[in-house]
């Protein structure tokens, strides 16, 4: 369905975001790594509690909720799929960044999850993590690496992805139940998206 021009009402209790899909079809020249003592750890068969904890710490302020709502069996099947790789950015011995690379599509890699905790925003850790993501993705037989971001994300996210070499190719509107109204997310998060009941 294509939305008509003009305003479209969103029912109370719902949230709506404009989602931008971005891609690259050739390996980019990576920007130089920033200074930092981070490391990357691959997490084979991640536990659901570990994953959801890091997912919340990275994304709760930006209304990441899909993996919190996802039933345990479905999330476990996804996380343990052989073509899906999960990594943690480690800072001072603690997991502070999340990277999910999905190679299930033929000849492509989707960066399904990408982000760092609030403690590392603005430190260069995200840039460092993106360099690792692109190194890993393009070391495989892929012709395309893609991801998506939305208007709920950090205000610098879209420009960051473009600086990293991605170009926008599609836009959608996503409408969902507000996760702050059913306890999926705390009521006080994401103040940039007002709760309307």
Each model region followed by its residue ranges:
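Conserved GNAT acetyl-CoA-binding A-motif
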Residues: 137-149
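Short amphipathic alpha-helix that is part of the acyltransferase structural core
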Residues: 34-66, 187
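Conserved beta-strand-loop-alpha-helix junction that forms the acyl-donor binding cleft
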Residues: 121, 147-157, 174-180, 184
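Conserved active-site alpha-helix within GNAT-family acetyltransferase domains
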Residues: 3-8, 152-171, 178
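Acyl-donor-binding surface of acyltransferase catalytic domains
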Residues: 1-39, 44
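Conserved glycine-rich acetyl-CoA-binding loop
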Residues: 117-131, 140, 152-156
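Acidic/histidine-enriched, glycine/proline-rich intrinsically disordered or flexible terminal extensions
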Residues: 2-17, 175-197
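A conserved beta-strand-loop-helix scaffold within acyl/acetyltransferase catalytic domains
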Residues: 66-73, 79-118
